[in-house]
């Protein structure tokens, strides 16, 4: 027996991610992995690859809005769901390694179970015992008492679970009979393993499939199992005889979804070949093609009166097909339309904006820094739009992009990509906020983290508690600076704190950080590299770039041919190097009019130098790199990236300009 607490031990490397999305996402933005129907009220629950569980009125006609609500707390694919307790509660399993317990009617997450150490792929439900099992890529199977799960609270967060051991490979399918006397798992071992969940004793191991077992159904009496495999076969097994009774070959590709009639006489199968087929187990040659979907089929579920079957695929639409075994081909009864998934992205050179292309060929522009979509460009040439917006500027990568859910998830970390790497001038990076006459340097990662956690005010340490006469402001705050001085991000933005490698630790919306519970959770979760810039207001380190400075061969004085090695912030512009050459290298030796070799004949040398000092350095000095004249506005890192193009230290040559 394992005792599980809903907390995390041991601090690991953490990363911060957020999703750029609308406040309400009414449509699935990616494939749908699983369905559950509440036959009492006709509510259809769908588990999306966009990390959202949505609830639909399945009895509405196509002209009415079927959307009821969204259930959001996962941050990766939701792989499976089960309705339990007469439809009052729902259990979900996700690639974020968690199992969650929901109030199905109100749509909120009641508790999160973190026992699994890898993707949780499948759930199984024993209705008569109110017991659920979870399994996944960590090869583990856990049994949960649902009544205990639904009673969990913040203070009572300990739950005991039974663990079933023996699986040698990652588990992709799981099934139990209603009375909970048999549990079966299918895995990449290509076998079925069977246990008695009451004792956790092994009953059988059944071999016969050639590939991963992706779908399972157990008969009500626990005597038979139907399995579907990536090998394209459907097999019927006798648990008592521990053998395969028959093999059905009606699909040309893997079988990923199975649905049985109540009397276990017919199997409805959905396949990677996009076909949904009904087969009579008593006469397997009697198979009827119900429909051919537009993409590989992921899950199947009866409609409220079992006259049709709901199907989901790699696409975001959910369709209901009429079940009519007497007809050669069925027809579509209803369709719950999905949205487009973003399939491609390109981060522009300024490392602030990115272009995306979705599954419907629409192109859009996103502002990563301000966490919003800027513009829908429609069905335009994606590559041309990238070229049109290409600039000769180099800013280091400071974030990564993940499109797994179909919506852009931006990841900030301190691992391979440092989120504090991008220092830019406010004039170049935030022109809409830059003030005339000033050009402060800003750090993109620092500004964004401050905006994401703008509503978070950590509880003060006990030894810093304010006493009588303390200096509190009119809002009751102790002078803390919130957010940043430039912008805020949308309040509905989800923020996720996770371990590098995938395990989710904490998820909340930007606006929810103000809550007492959320604030305390953040205090336990937020890594020090984030609190340093958000709370302590530590300024991230500038990145230095070494370079050599030499006189150009065209310069008259050959004694200036020695190499000078300098180190400067990588974002300084070439004009600053020109100023250094003018003031520190050439100094008073440079005449006011550099093109006049007889300038010593001027009436007043001092007057000439005074006049010349008013001329900007870049108009008197020219910088070259690889014999290319550098634009004074170009910064050092851009020169290195576009002109120098070498791993060795950057080298400049300088020369005076002729009039």
Curated annotation (Swiss-Prot):
Renumbered residue ranges of the record's region Disordered: 592-613
Domain of life of the native organism: Eukaryota
Biased composition (Low complexity): 596-610
GO molecular function: ubiquitin binding
One of the Pfam families matching this protein, by short name: DUF3337
CDD domains with a match to the protein in the record: Ubl_WDR48 (cd17041), WD40 (cd00200)
BP terms from Gene Ontology: double-strand break repair via homologous recombination
WD repeat residue intervals: 27-66, 73-112, 115-154, 166-205, 208-247, 250-289, 292-331, 337-376
Entry coiled-coil feature ranges: none
Keyword set, alphabetical order: Repeat, Ubl conjugation pathway, WD repeat
General function of this protein: Regulatory component of the Usp12-46 deubiquitylase complex. activates deubiquitination by increasing the catalytic turnover without increasing the affinity of deubiquitinating enzymes for the substrate. The complex deubiquitylates the wg/wingless-signaling receptor arr/arrow, which stabilizes the receptor and increases its concentration at the cell surface; this enhances the sensitivity of cells to wg/wingless-signal stimulation.
Family statement drawn from the similarity comment of this UniProt entry: Belongs to the WD repeat WDR48 family.
Protein's name in the database: WD repeat-containing protein 48 homolog
Organism, scientific name: Aedes aegypti (Yellowfever mosquito)
